[in-house]
Amino acid sequence: MDVNPTLLFLKVPAQNAISTTFPYTGDPPYSHGTGTGYTMDTVNRTHQYSERGKWTTNTETGAPQLNPIDGPLPKDNEPSGYAQTDCVLEAMAFLEGSHPGIFENSCLETMEVVQQTRVDKLTQGRQTYDWTLNRNQPAATALANTIEVFRSNGLTANESGRLIDFLKDVMESMDKEEMEIITHFQRKRRVRDNMTKKMITQRTIGKKKQRLNKRSYLIRALTLNTMTKDAERGKLKRRAIATPGMQIRGFVYFVETLARSICEKLEQSGLPVGGNEKKAKLANVVRKMMTNSQDTELSFTITGDNTKWNENQNPRMFLAMITYITRNQPEWFRNVLSIAPIMFSNKMARLGKGYMFESKSMKLRTQIPAEMLASIDLKYFNESTRKKIEKIRPLLIDGTASLSPGMMMGMFNMLSTVLGVSILNLGQKRYTKTTYWWDGLQSSDDFALIVNAPNHEGIQAGVDRFYRTCKLVGINMSKKKSYINRTGTFEFTSFFYRYGFVANFSMELPSFGVSGINESADMSIGVTVIKNNMINNDLGPATAQMALQLFIKDYRYTYRCHRGDTQIQTRRSFELKKLWEQTRSKAGLLVSDGGPNLYNIRNLHIPEVCLKWELMDEDYQGRLCNPLNPFISHKEIESVNNAVVMPAHGPAKSMEYDAVATTHSWIPKRNRSILNTSQRGILEDEQMYQKCCNLFEKFFPSSSYRRPVGISSMVEAMVSRARIDARIDFESGRIKKEEFAEIMKICFTIEELRRQK
């Protein structure tokens, strides 16, 4: 979609056009190849920031660990991770002092969540490090594999139980002397193809059992796999992100639940709210500071940037915070919450795929896996890589690097926000005991600081004090990248504030366009995005109308569904023309069937099928909305579906759109080429799982099969349900006596087989 940006800004004040300077149009940069280098950078940097800490060795895994807590305070502006425990605890105490009962209440809320959360919570999320296969898998598969291994090792894991019970298993697994796992491996054979008589490589997948001793198992349980963060705009260098395994995930979830509950009660926290709610929260803080400073005081705002937030945070500090926050709570609760930070203090970073070497002269390519980096001769590497490897070598164990200090990206966003807010909270006059005071906003590593004082010297003193207070808890405000302005103009989490928030429309640009799900969903998502931007982002009526026309054009080109009376020739035009000619009411045809577009900015909230229903020929209605149409594999379609739209920064966000099920709501079938790869075993497991779930849903039509049915197993539940249904059908005359007898016989046989097993 080409839009000339100047058209959008003819009548826009200059400050509103700031968003056009953002790197948001066009494709974002993606990373290729291995993330090993980026991960080594992270590990080395993190250790450098804490280098004056104390070294110890983990007695269980033998991993060398660096502990910077209560280490020497930095003399200058260098970023450092030497947080002081007593300062953090005092900041927590002051935070509680200004918000009486906040920790107590959040603990009670969290306790309730802990007792109710089921283990299927862990199936949410995308790629997860699967410790049994030592690589990433979809979350649901990784959980299933973990539970399977736990079971075969005598733990009571149950995929429909409470998450807390699963976590007890995790704790027990760490005490076991060994764990037996099932791994997939590939065999390659050279064989002659009968047809072509050429030699080909055949791959077969085997499953084999493998025993892990306690040390190896602990290393895997504490491992975070690393990948390169994709699609980051406005950066020259890529960076590494981490994905933890199933052992850590559940514990992190509960800690974040507690921290989220605290953040919700803090007016300075930019999390967990978003969008307009966040803007309102921010506007309140600004209003408070402006109102108080009108006559006598100056008010300045810093658009803040912290240096390497994650790499200077420390899990040991989080442990201290949790210990304080939960101090009057029952022992079991305190234990559950303290495990996540303890695991993170002992974490291992997996270095990823390793390096690829190719020799131009001999046309050879070879992969050096991360496991070999500890022993390989360094003459093969260039100078910068050589330095990285030399530095990281003392930390390596089995292809993972011991990484005790620092938090990997995105793990404890909420809890680190609580820490940031606790420093903002210290800016009240009753704490500063002087003429300056501050307040601000914190959202993970992003902050805005508003300082009020009678004169410029006071402002400077306030900023200095804030800066030094942050240093005490391991937060490093970057003097180079933060800038100060009269209050009224600042930026926070890509919201631009200029006497009110300016709509940063360019951030939404990437979500305009055709999503590529299917014809039905794409139409619905496209118009919903335009509607939402009219509501939230100052998208004016003329621009919205233009966006709509561009969208329809884009949509028609994507699905080759130009109007039936067009001259454009595509693969589909023959069929669509035929349909156009035999349709009486042409306005009733959907755009994807070559019909005209009836959308305008007034009716974007109506699904296209509903908009055109009255205009459709009767037989077209019958074909379009026919659940028995053999060409469709229908999902159960809720009245509202969720699409993932990509804003220009931050995670992909979920957006609701109206879903009307038609024959255009198809689901593409899986690519077959997976069958020849090492994923095949997993695919078979997935299909098995899918079949069981489908079968279960046939018995319980309204069921979401993730919920357990009482205490009985799936099979028992299905058998008893089959019996009840059969009896009802027999008594109402829907089935004959013979059929009824046969069903009863099958049910009996199944139960017998179960007993024998």
Curated annotation (Swiss-Prot):
Domain RdRp catalytic: 286-483
Catalysed reactions listed for this entry: RNA(n) + a ribonucleoside 5'-triphosphate = RNA(n+1) + diphosphate
Stretch list, region Disordered: 53-82
Modification after translation, per record: Phosphorylated by host PRKCA.
Cellular location(s): Host nucleus; Host cytoplasm
EC number: 2.7.7.48
UniProt entry tagged with the keyword Nucleotidyltransferase: yes
Native organism: Influenza A virus (strain A/Duck/Czechoslovakia/1956 H4N6)
Top-level taxon: Viruses
A GO molecular function held by the record: RNA binding
Function, in words: RNA-dependent RNA polymerase which is responsible for replication and transcription of virus RNA segments. The transcription of viral mRNAs occurs by a unique mechanism called cap-snatching. 5' methylated caps of cellular mRNAs are cleaved after 10-13 nucleotides by PA. In turn, these short capped RNAs are used as primers by PB1 for transcription of viral mRNAs. During virus replication, PB1 initiates RNA synthesis and copy vRNA into complementary RNA (cRNA) which in turn serves as a template for the production of more vRNAs.
Primary site of residence: host cell
Description of how the protein assembles with itself and partners: Influenza RNA polymerase is composed of three subunits: PB1, PB2 and PA. Interacts (via N-terminus) with PA (via C-terminus). Interacts (via C-terminus) with PB2 (via N-terminus); this interaction is essential for transcription initiation.
GO biological process, one term: symbiont-mediated suppression of host gene expression
Chain intervals with Polar residues compositional bias: 55-64
Region (Promoter-binding site): 249-256
Keyword Transferase listed: yes
Keywords from the UniProt entry: Eukaryotic host gene expression shutoff by virus, Eukaryotic host transcription shutoff by virus, Host cytoplasm, Host gene expression shutoff by virus, Host nucleus, Host-virus interaction, Inhibition of host RNA polymerase II by virus, Nucleotide-binding, Nucleotidyltransferase, Phosphoprotein, RNA-directed RNA polymerase, Transferase, Viral RNA replication, Viral transcription
Location of the motif Nuclear localization signal: 187-195, 203-216
Chain coiled-coil ranges: none
Protein name: RNA-directed RNA polymerase catalytic subunit
Entries under Gene3D superfamilies matching the protein: 6.10.140.720
Family under the similarity heading: Belongs to the influenza viruses polymerase PB1 family.
GO cellular component: host cell cytoplasm; host cell nucleus
